[in-house]
Amino acid sequence: MAKEIKKPVKVETENPMRAVKLEKVVLNCGGSAEKLEKSVKLLGLITGRKVKEIASNKRIPSFGVRPGLKLGCTVTIRGEEKLKLLKRLFGAVDNKLKRKKIKENHFSFGIKEYLEIPDMEYQRDIGILGLDVTAVFVRPGKRVILKKAKRGRLPVKQHVTIAEIEDFVTNKLGVELE
């Protein structure tokens, strides 16, 4: 009588290291002097966070740019607020995103006037301004390129592809792709 050897049954589970998640949402607004002050107020009003002003590093005489000249401002949103904010900002563009705006690991879109954002009212001291929105995606394992000791490289297979971002945007955010 021969013993029958049972092979373990493999359960098809999704690899947790292949999961795609939204890392951060970055809002950016440019301008110099008076427009920069208005941009800082606008981004603070939209996010409720502290805004960082961006200064130039290079000298470009044809544009009148010198090192240390403040040219724009930015806010990075992480944590639980990022999805709520991104859904709200997509409301300004009628929940639509052009496919050509999606790149590997991120997508970006612009909002021409902040008045298009739901629940935003006209602010007399700000006037009419627009802003840029960038959403960055990541997989687990990115720490390899961020750590100081024994730093490694992120292989191409760990990048988030355009198709995966399209899937995330349509399923989780309910955005229509054009």
Language model regions located:
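Ribosome-associated RNA-binding proteins
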Residues: 2-178
